[in-house]
């Protein structure tokens, strides 16, 4: 008789495997990114380092907020989440990756000057650039591997692609736009948010109306993507809870009545996979 093989905790039943969502919404300051993030369904924790959380509060968001003033605060938030047996949130929002990158650079240069007082805190050397690029990539990967849905926000930048055409991307510096492209590759949805005045027919007449437009599939010069292929190309005045529900419906092949019920099912799977997640997280810590 064959001896039963004891499987490592990293191997689980397919029915217990939960694929969490990783989204990125980018746009100009004041376009409403944080307001939309604050309207995510379920229990939301915003890791906030920009003032957009005030606007989210005014719109009635019930999200919790963890103030991120320095890179070390972000590391502390990650460490806390990674070491929980069960994360008590449905979504973690990092607002924004653009500002987090600035805080990462400041953290690196503070340490550089402590070790070498003759160095200028405002002039990174080549090795310092490599360090913050790798630290940013590690940070994004680590948060995205947590057993929870994650939404990032970012400001926008314009770069020139290899054909000489403009491309609008999340503002993440490094190697022209290679680091920004790498971050986008880690996401299931990359969407661009902008405030626009468009012509629409209202009561039989064409009028100019203000809309908040979310571009969710590539529309040159804007880079965007929807891995689920269910969100369309553009969404005016988006309701992010409805967009999340579309994705959940596409996963099951039928409407899901309540996100909360799905969260409860995920909680059971999370308990069974906590050991595996913690092992992976410990190997790939945010470097602080």
Language model features: what each stretch is:
Residues 44-46, 150, 190-192:
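Short, well-ordered beta-strand core segments
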Residues 80-84, 103, 153, 186, ...:
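Conserved, well-folded catalytic cores of nucleic-acid-processing
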Residues 97-182:
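P-loop NTPase motor core
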């Amino acid at each position: 008789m064959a001896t039963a093989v004891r499987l490592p905790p990293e191997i689980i039943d397919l029915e217990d495997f939960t694929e969490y969502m990783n989204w990125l919404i980018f746009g100009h300051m004041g376009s409403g990114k944080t307001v939309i993030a604050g309207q995510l369904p379920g229990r939301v924790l915003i890791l906030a380092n920009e003032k957009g959380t005030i606007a989210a509060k005014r719109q009635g968001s019930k999200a919790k907020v963890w103030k991120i003033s320095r890179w070390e605060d972000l590391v502390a938030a990650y460490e806390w989440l990674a070491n929980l047996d069960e994360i008590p949130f449905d979504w973690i929002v990092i607002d924004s990756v653009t500002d987090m990158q600035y805080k990462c650079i400041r953290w690196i240069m503070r340490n550089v000057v402590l070790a070498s007082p003759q160095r200028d805190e405002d002039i990174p050397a080549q090795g310092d650039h490599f360090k913050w690029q790798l630290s940013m990539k590690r940070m994004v990967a680590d948060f995205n591997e947590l057993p929870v849905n994650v939404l990032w926000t970012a400001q926008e930048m314009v770069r020139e692609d290899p054909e000489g055409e403009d491309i609008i991307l999340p503002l993440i510096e490094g190697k022209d736009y290679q680091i920004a492209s790498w971050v986008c590759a880690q996401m299931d949805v990359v969407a661009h948010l902008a405030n626009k005045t468009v012509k629409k027919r209202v009561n039989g007449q064409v009028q100019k109306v203000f809309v908040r437009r979310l571009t969710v599939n590539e529309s040159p010069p804007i880079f965007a993507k929807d891995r689920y292929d269910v969100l369309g190309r553009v969404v005016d005045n988006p309701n992010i809870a409805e967009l999340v529900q579309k994705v959940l419906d596409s996963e099951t092949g039928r409407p899901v009545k309540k996100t909360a019920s799905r969260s409860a099912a995920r909680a059971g799977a999370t308990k069974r996979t906590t050991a595996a997640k913690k092992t992976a997280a410990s190997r790939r810590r945010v470097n602080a």
